[in-house]
Amino acid sequence: MRRLFVVLSLFVVAKAFGQEDDRKNTIYLNFTNRVIFNDAFIIGYERVLKPNRTFTVNIGTISLPRFTDKSNNDSVQLLGGSGNKGFHFSADYRFYLSKENKYEAPRGVYLGPYYAFNYAERANQWNLNTSTFTGGVNTKMSLSIHTVGLQFGYQFVVWDRLALDFALLGPGLGVYNIKASINTNLSEDQKELFYEKLNSFMAEKIPGYDRVIDEGEFNNKGSTNTTSFGYRYMINIGYRF
C-alpha cells in the first residue's frame, strides 16, 4: 500500500511539473495606459515559442482625457463632450536572457523590439461669442502615435500561474499626428482661439505632450505631424495556462 501511495505521489508530482512545462500561454490585463488615457481597457497574450523566446500582442480601447475649462475667457466656453473613442495595438518579440535567468521563459529578465499604435479622438461642444459670430461650435480632436523601439523588462511568476510583467525601460522612435477639425465656417482668428484652447487641454492632460508636439504649428493650422522620442513603460498582471 505504501509503495502504491509513493508511486501515485510521484505520478501526481510528475504530472504537475509536466503541466507547468506545458504552460506556454499567458493572458494579461494592462494597468499602465490608464495613467495616460481615460477608460483604457487593454488585454494581452504571450506565447512561448522557444525556451528563451516569446511573442506578445496587446489590443484594447482607450480614450483621450476629459477636457475641463478653467479659464475665464468668455469668448470661448466649453459646454461639454459629445463623444470619444480610441484603439490600442502593440506587439513585441522577447528574448529571455538564459545567462541571467534561472528559469526558462516566460520568467526573468528579457529584452526585445516592440511596436505600438495608439489612436484616440474626442468631440466637444462649445459656445463662441465674438463680434462677428455667436453660437455653438463642434470640434473633434484626434491623436495618433506610432512607436517602434527596444524594451527591457522583468517578469515574475508566482504560484506557477500568476504572472507579473514589468516593461521597465522602452526607448523608441515615435511618429505623432494630432489634428483638430471644426464643423463651422469661422475666420482664421476664430479658429486659432479653438486651436489654442485644445492645445492647452492636451498639454495639461497628457504627460510629455509639450516635448514632442510643435505647439506653434498646431495653434496656427490645427494640425501637426512630427517624429520624436518615444517611450514604453508597461505593467501587466497575467494568468498562465
Regions found by a protein language model. Name each.
Residues 19-24, 51-52, 98-108, 158-164:
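Short loop/turn motifs that connect adjacent beta-strands in outer-membrane beta-barrel proteins
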Residues 25-29, 55-59, 89, 107-115, ...:
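Transmembrane beta-strands of outer-membrane beta-barrel proteins
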Residues 30-32, 64-88, 120-145, 173-228:
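Extracellular/periplasm-exposed beta-strand and loop segments of Gram-negative cell-envelope proteins
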Residues 31-35, 59-65, 95-97, 115-121, ...:
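Transmembrane beta-strands of outer-membrane beta-barrel pores
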Residues 46-48, 94-100, 153-157, 238-240:
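Structural signature of outer-membrane beta-barrel channels/translocons
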Residues 90, 94, 227-241:
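Outer-membrane beta-barrel "beta-signal"
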